[in-house]
Regions:
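Bacterial N-terminal signal peptides
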Residues: 7-16
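Catalytic Zn2+-binding segment of zinc metalloproteases
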Residues: 75-85
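Active-site His/Glu-centered metal-binding helix of metallohydrolases
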Residues: 69-77, 340
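Boundary at the C-terminal end of the N-terminal hydrophobic targeting segment
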Residues: 18-21, 25
């Protein structure tokens, strides 16, 4: 069995930054009366348009008992609406309501009783459920959304859920953007969560596959220990027990609370006339009523006043992690720590110019010192991640077992490297080199229409697109 050591601390390091290059974006903005923001960047050339919609909702908007719901909801948004994905809405709805009633009974037996319920009753209800599922299938049109998009030249239909936001993406010919407006406004206003229980099984299988990866459980527990109170305490996939017990009514309430126009931003980048985009947005999205004001997260991460240590054993290489609480996105020192991580680790981050940085490249200070010179580690990395409400600075290293190097030996060596930075700082040449790399990488990300839309959308949800 391999042993892993994790240290959880608080870190304050200041690095002066050379002024970053200014990026100018030709963004046109329009806000509908219901609060939906439309951001447009016209780019003449290839007659295609990248269409993204971002909702300001992610795993941080969950609570204990419904963790993983934001990600599950993303899956369910591809199951159709009242008019899409079903051949006979009324007949299907009648069956679907019976399915919900049967599953509610099964849930009561399984989860609301101390002994796991009446097994004979559960078996009978399960048989009834299986028969209803067979009846339901005759009315379901599989992959209706994707099929319709593909028939009209659509590519790249996808979605993603993070801690703080959820995005839905498609690229279409310029003359088919109206189709995206029609379909996405329909999903926003009339999403229908058919096949909920089978899709929940799909998400639970995703989690099982993650659990089979070496080190998954330990990393999950490290994260839970590091973020003790805030909703960053759990991962986007959620806890398995919550996934088992989450109900369709939980999902419906989640949808009503967060999938509203005043909690979203639509991004269009490509060959189009902005006036036409605004007119179509008013026509389709403008008819959706404004939703309730979205409540911000309540629980912020409290200060950590003492060191935490975790030891674990399992089928994974021996390693050490050291994590430090750090400034969150937008705070002055978050950019400095991103640069420091790249100097130490010499790798690439993401999520904006200075939202994340670091890596484990062969040109970083840590690699030169701990791998090449002292030969204490097989690999070593440093990373900085600044999120909306929390930040983390992290070291990871794998000791040289052939030289009997222990995690404690590596811990001591890492502290020595930290002290060097605190005592001697970093050179202007190191800062300039990293800044050049970060700027080049950031500009490359903006050179693609999809990368530009993604950067713009996520920034718009947080501190505004002008902070890009």
């Amino acid at each position: 069995m391999k042993r892993t050591l994790v240290l959880l601390f608080t870190l304050i390091v200041c690095v002066s930054l050379i002024g970053a290059a200014e990026i100018k974006l030709d963004v046109q903005e329009h806000t509908l009366s219901n609060g939906l923001r439309i951001l447009m960047i016209p780019k003449a050339g290839v007659p295609r348009v990248v269409c993204h919609i971002y909702y300001k909702v992610g795993s941080i908007n969950e609570r204990p008992g419904i963790t993983g719901l934001a990600h599950l909801h993303e899956h369910m948004m591809f199951k159709g609406t009242e008019i899409m994905g079903v051949s006979d809405f009324e007949k299907h709805t009648a069956i679907d309501q019976k399915l919900d009633a049967v599953m509610n009974e099964i849930f009561r037996e399984m989860f609301w009783t101390a002994d796991g319920g009446d097994q004979d009753k559960i078996a009978r209800l399960q048989k009834e459920y299986d028969e209803l599922v067979k009846s339901e299938k005759q009315y379901i049109i599989k992959d209706a959304l994707w099929t319709l998009y593909m028939k009209n030249g659509g590519t790249g239909l996808n979605a993603s859920t993070g801690n703080e936001s959820t995005g839905y993406y498609v690229t279409l010919p310029s003359n088919k953007v109206e189709l995206q407006m029609l379909l996405e406004s329909d999903r926003m206003a009339h999403a229908y969560f058919r096949e909920f229980y089978s899709e929940k099984d799909v998400v639970m299988e995703e989690r099982r596959l993650s659990e089979n990866r070496p080190g998954f459980y330990f990393s999950e527990q490290v994260n839970a220990a590091f973020y003790s109170a805030s909703p960053y305490h759990w991962g986007v996939i959620g806890w398995m027990d919550d996934l088992r017990k989450v109900t369709k009514s939980d999902l419906v309430e989640f949808n009503k609370s967060y999938y509203v126009p005043n909690n979203a931003v639509a991004i269009y980048v490509g060959d189009f006339d902005p006036e036409n985009i605004v007119a179509m947005a008013e026509k389709y999205f403008g008819r959706i009523p404004k939703g309730p004001d979205v409540e911000p997260i309540r629980t912020y991460e409290p200060p950590q006043y003492s060191e935490k240590r975790m030891y674990g054993t399992g089928p994974a290489p021996t390693s050490i992690q050291m994590m430090f609480h750090a400034p969150y996105a937008g705070q002055d020192d978050s950019a400095a720590l991103s640069v420091l991580a790249s100097i130490l680790g010499s790798g690439g981050g993401g999520g904006g110019r200075f939202r994340g940085g670091g890596g484990g490249g062969g040109t970083g200070r840590l690699y030169k010192s701990l791998v090449q010179e002292k030969q204490l580690a097989v690999s070593v990395s440093a990373s900085s991640r600044a999120m909306w409400y929390v930040g983390a600075f992290q070291f990871r290293a794998t000791p040289r077992q052939d030289k009997n190097v222990s995690p404690e030996d590596l811990e001591k060596a890492l502290w020595e490297e930290i002290e060097k930075v605190k005592q001697d700082g970093v050179t202007s040449e190191e800062i300039q080199k990293v800044q050049n790399q970060v700027e080049a990488r950031f500009i490359r990300s903006l050179s693609s229409t999809a990368g530009l839309a993604r950067t713009l959308g996520r920034a718009a949800l947080h501190r505004g697109w002008r902070t890009v």
